[in-house]
């Protein structure tokens, strides 16, 4: 199967900890800079991948202030508003390393589940944990340096898409 990274690009949240070492922040706590447009509310695409400076992640805020739609390089789009409606401030997507898998932290919205299933991905954290994968989730408003999952191994996964 084609790697999820190559299909979707790399997406990450702008929280604290590790992210703070790469980016300055505006008063709202969002990352700012050349790779983080509109105070972290937008996205910049570089060479077919979302980019966030040295970290290679995207410029997203963890407080719910972001683009209304995330459009991946292959044309796949996920409505952030729809996800927020379904999950509130819950972080929905996360990435495991080195496995390059994406999944939802809870049951995915109906419009997202078919996409994950088509990519051969788990639909929720429990399913992924049962597979023995290492993963990290960025809690709502959380700090990247304190985001390791109780079910995973600290320090091995990163890259939550935070709402």
Swiss-Prot record:
Q: What organism, scientifically named, is this protein from?
A: Homo sapiens
Q: Where is this region: Disordered?
A: 144-163
Top-level taxon in the UniProt lineage: Eukaryota
Question: Corresponding gene?
Answer: LINC00696
Q: What is the recorded name of this protein?
A: Putative uncharacterized protein encoded by LINC00696
Q: Where is the composition biased (Gly residues)?
A: 154-163
């Amino acid at each position: 199967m084609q790697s999820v990274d190559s299909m979707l690009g790399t997406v990450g949240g702008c929280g604290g900890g590790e992210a703070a070492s790469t980016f300055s922040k505006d008063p709202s706590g969002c990352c700012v800079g050349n790779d983080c447009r509109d105070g972290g509310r937008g996205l910049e695409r570089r060479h077919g991948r979302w980019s966030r400076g040295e970290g290679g992640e995207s410029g997203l805020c963890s407080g719910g202030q972001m683009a209304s739609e995330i459009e991946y390089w292959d044309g796949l789009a996920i409505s952030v508003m729809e996800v927020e409606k379904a999950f509130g401030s819950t972080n929905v997507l996360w990435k495991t390393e080195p496995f390059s898998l994406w999944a939802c932290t809870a049951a995915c919205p109906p419009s997202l589940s078919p996409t994950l299933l088509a990519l051969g991905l788990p639909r929720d954290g429990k399913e992924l944990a049962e597979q023995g994968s290492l993963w990290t989730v960025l809690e709502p408003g959380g700090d990247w340096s304190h985001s390791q999952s109780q079910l995973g191994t600290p320090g091995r996964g990163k890259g939550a898409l935070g709402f």
